[in-house]
A protein has these predicted regions:
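Charged, heptad-repeat coiled-coil alpha-helices that serve as long linker/dimerization "arms"
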Residues: 1-104
C-alpha cells in the first residue's frame, strides 16, 4: 500500500505542477480533468502526509530512547506517533479503494 501511495503522491505533485502552468489552462477540458483528478486525490494525499509525519515522529522518538534524560518523553512520543500511524493507516486503507480499483 505504501508503494502505491508514494506513486500517487508523485502523480499528485505532477498534477499540481501541470495546474500551475498557464498552457494547461488554455485547454479548459484538460484543466477541468486535472482539477477533478487533484480533488479526488487530495483527501488521500492529506492522510498520507499525516501518516508520514507520524512515521517521522516515531523514528525520531526511537532514536531518543537511548538517551536516559529523554527516555520517558521519547516513550510517550513514540506511543502517540504509533497510535497516529495506526489510525491514519486505517483511514488510508478505507480511502485508497476510492482511488485505486481493488484489482490493482
Amino acid at each position: 500500500m505504501l508503494e502505491k501511495l508514494k506513486g500517487l503522491s508523485q502523480k499528485y505533485a505532477e498534477i499540481e505542477y501541470m495546474l500551475s502552468q498557464s498552457e494547461v489552462w488554455a485547454d479548459a477540458q484538460k484543466a477541468a480533468a486535472l482539477s477533478r483528478e487533484k480533488a479526488e486525490l487530495a483527501p488521500l494525499m492529506e492522510a498520507y502526509a499525516r501518516y508520514e509525519t507520524f512515521r517521522q515522529e516515531a523514528e525520531s522518538a526511537e532514536e531518543l530512547l537511548s538517551d536516559p534524560e529523554m527516555k520517558d518523553l521519547a516513550r510517550e512520543t513514540l506511543s502517540e506517533a504509533r497510535s497516529g500511524m495506526e489510525r491514519t493507516a486505517e483511514e488510508l486503507k478505507i480511502n485508497i479503494g476510492s482511488v485505486i480499483p481493488r484489482s490493482e
